[in-house]
Amino acid sequence: MKAIQITEFGGPEAMELVELEDPQPGPGETVVEITRSGVNFADTHATRNEYLAAQELPLIPGVEFVGRTPEGKRVAGVVPSGAYAERIAVPVAGLVPIPDGVDDDQAVALLIQGLTADAILRVSAHLAVGESVVVNAAAGGTGSLAVQIARAMGAGRVIGLASSDEKRSLVLELGADDALDSAATGLGDRVREANGGEVDVVLEMAGGDAFDELASTLAPFGRMVTFGIATRQENTVRTGSLMKHSRAIVGFWITHLLARPELVRAGLERVMGAAAAGELRTVIGGVYPLSGAAQAHQALVGRNSTGKLLLDPSS
């Protein structure tokens, strides 16, 4: 089979298209013919061995996929690695059936990103009806879904942050009340002005200056969920400031969600059901051939993409 493999850690240039032996299923496993693989920021960290979990070489990147079983069933799955390939051997118990009305592109966009968007709002932020929400990277795979889910949950004012006019127009189309330039100076002041005061919930995945600016916008009992560090700049949280302002900073790593099957099942049922009913729109930013994995990573890290990026192992 064809696969993307890295034999030494590095950036996009470390990924090579290689020919490997087909995987053989172990006890309780099946081999899935992959039709789509998702591209995530976590993959770009993994190829550099900068992710939260240490990686081992040789490595086939990729943590999510959609495909068909030998019986022809359409299924989706999340794995520690190995999805940038034509085939993968996985436990049958971990596969999720894809409902009618959801195509392969949509299904991949609803796995990591759909679960994350749903969980950071419901499980981490405990969003209540009428509360204001700020979504950073609101035109991205997770952010674009979070804007819509927040609106469906009855949020008050929803403000999306994005880096270009095109992306901000998309954020408004998805239901945000306002869309601000995430790259302009004075982000915290502009968020407070757009909301008419401090905010209740912030969803943040950039780190660095954006983290500090957005944390300063939280109202008393406001919650900021940090679910990524795209800038690779970690922040220091001052506990005295949290106490003084009655603010909460909550971390989210999907690995811990995946260890809770009941939460995964409920989350996927919600997002897949909403998509099948036409109530949740997935934004696909591009479908690359397997040989284009490096280009997909460059687009993601360079913030030159909108929505979810996918790989098509068959092309």
At which residue positions do the language-model features occur?
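Short SAM/SAH-binding signature in class I
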Residues: 199-203, 222
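NAD(P)H dinucleotide-binding glycine-rich loop of Rossmann-like/cofactor-binding domains
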Residues: 45, 58-64, 75-139
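C-terminal capping/lid region of NAD(P)-dependent oxidoreductase domains
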Residues: 272, 279-284, 294-315
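Glycine-rich phosphate-binding loop and adjacent beta-alpha segment
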Residues: 155, 209-279, 312-315
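Mid-domain Rossmann-like dinucleotide-binding core that forms the NAD(H)/NADP(H) cofactor-binding site
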Residues: 108-184
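Short amphipathic alpha-helix with an adjacent loop that forms part of the alpha/beta core around
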Residues: 186-196
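Glycine-rich beta-strand-centered segment in the early N-terminal region that forms part
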Residues: 21-39, 46-82, 89
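Short, glycine/polar-rich helix-capping loops at beta-to-alpha or helix-loop-helix junctions
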Residues: 83-85, 162-170, 234-239
